[in-house]
Amino acid sequence: MDALRRILQHEDESLPLDEAALLLARIEYPDLPLAPWLAELDFHARQIRRLSLYGFRNAAHNYLFGELAFSGNGDDYYNPRNSCLNSVLESRRGIPITLSIVYIELARRLGITVDGIPAPGHFLVRIEDDGDTYYIDVFNNGKIRDDIEGEVDPRFLVPATKRMILIRMLNNLRLIYLQRQAWHKAAAVLDLLLLADPGDADALRQRAAARAALHHYQAACSDLSRYLTLRPLDPGKDELKAQISNLRRMHAHKH
């Protein structure tokens, strides 16, 4: 996970996106080996190369969305496994961002640049082909979004960096794990988000809740204290101070 942490802290972006996404999947699958899934991506890239007489975009479309039937998992959208690259490769179902990573990484193996586009609410990929620009909705069977430039603020059509993609994935998992009260996994996600942005007050408050649920009372106290430093005018500050006092008592009782 050290390589993942370096990306999030702006220290190093040399790790390929597929490896970074698989490392992130270890929150859900702690013993996940990377090599078999990287090999599967290699295999799919070779299959697309075999079809590339028709150009990468057409070959990738026919192979991924035709032969393999990759598609969006609309029936179980908020399953955390949709954010795990290994699970998406196995089930051929996922959410926009993980399906986009599959597309981006297959293209990279063939020397083709494909950008991830962080459109609001729906991640897309963008490819240049024969002088034309195509926005592809991998969640909807590779549909070409001809309308996107007229509908979306140009600021959201700037390609996402690797770090931005990982943070977006982490934010997806944050919501899911908090809603499911999967406190260990939520805390792991929030640790990474706070590495990326130590001043994320909301993440601090959420991690405090996760830590308290895990009986890590002193650590929860620390997070709430930092939260109040960042948000001194929070309307609920008196209640939060009472929570801190209560957590300190619980920590003292525990020890």
List where the protein language model places each region.
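A structural boundary/capping signal
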Residues: 1-255
